[in-house]
Amino acid sequence: MATGSRTSLLLAFGLLCLPWLQEGSAFPTIPLSRLFDNAMLRAHRLHQLAFDTYQEFEEAYIPKEQKYSFLQNPQTSLCFSESIPTPSNREETQQKSNLELLRISLLLIQSWLEPVQFLRSVFANSLVYGASDSNVYDLLKDLEEGIQTLMGRLEDGSPRTGQIFKQTYSKFDTNSHNDDALLKNYGLLYCFRKDMDKVETFLRIVQCRSVEGSCGF
């Protein structure tokens, strides 16, 4: 076959395939159920890591009497996420729209992107499987992207992007031999566990409302 004819055939084939390639890479081709499944897997993993690491740290470093005084003191047990308007009970949660719950979940996830790095020494010494600051950070970033995608799908079919939420947790000494640092680490782990529980709960409610047959799982 002549070189010119072969080039023409290749060009024609490329033009025919172009619309298929564009459609195949388009956002709406991913089933909504799969998007929710992926988000829920990450949310559950983060919640489990947060719970296990918190429990492990508490048993290793925090005496019972110190735990009770910490939890009963509003100043030490106050989480930064308290500044993010979130429903405080089941009734309030059910009154929120899907987009409102996703937006709250996104803010909670973004509020931990930097603070989770302060817990580097805690994760490094943890025996909990998968508990490393890099792994937790990657899960947070993946879930952030997943929630933004879900928000875009529920709005107009386009991925939702936005600026990262700025948190105000202050940096502090994470030396494990410093009692003050121990309590601050304990406080961060307490808040991290609490916030990841909220995120998983809110995402499960939105999934139940949006995907048929997904309630109760």
Curated annotation (Swiss-Prot):
One of its GO terms (biological process) is positive regulation of multicellular organism growth. Keywords: Disease variant, Disulfide bond, Dwarfism, Hormone, Metal-binding, Pharmaceutical, Phosphoprotein, Secreted, Signal, Zinc. Disulfide bonds join 79-191, 208-215. Residues 1-26 form the signal peptide. Changing residue 205 to M: In short stature; idiopathic autosomal. The modification Deamidated asparagine is found at residue 178. Changing residue 79 to S: In short stature; idiopathic autosomal; affects binding affinity of GH for GHR and the potency of GH to activate the JAK2/STAT5 signaling pathway. It holds the Pfam family Hormone_1. One of its GO terms (cellular component) is endosome lumen. Changing residue 201 to A: In IGHD1B; reduced ability to activate the JAK/STAT pathway. Zn(2+) binds at residues 44, 200. It is found in: Secreted. Changing residue 53 to I: In IGHD1B; reduced ability to activate the JAK/STAT pathway. Its main location: secreted. GO terms for molecular function: cytokine activity; growth factor activity; growth hormone activity; growth hormone receptor binding; hormone activity; metal ion binding; prolactin receptor binding. The modification Phosphoserine is found at residues 132, 176. Plays an important role in growth control. Its major role in stimulating body growth is to stimulate the liver and other tissues to secrete IGF1. It stimulates both the differentiation and proliferation of myoblasts. It also stimulates amino acid uptake and protein synthesis in muscle and other tissues. It is linked to Growth hormone deficiency, isolated, 1A: An autosomal recessive, severe deficiency of growth hormone leading to dwarfism. Patients often develop antibodies to administered growth hormone. Circulating GH shows a great heterogeneity due to alternative splicing, differential post-translational modifications of monomeric forms, oligomerization, optional binding to 2 different GH-binding proteins, and potentially proteolytic processing. Monomer, dimer, trimer, tetramer and pentamer, disulfide-linked or non-covalently associated, in homomeric and heteromeric combinations. Can also form a complex either with GHBP or with the alpha2-macroglobulin complex. This is Somatotropin. It comes from Homo sapiens. The lineage of its organism: Eukaryota, Metazoa, Chordata, Craniata, Vertebrata. The gene is GH1.
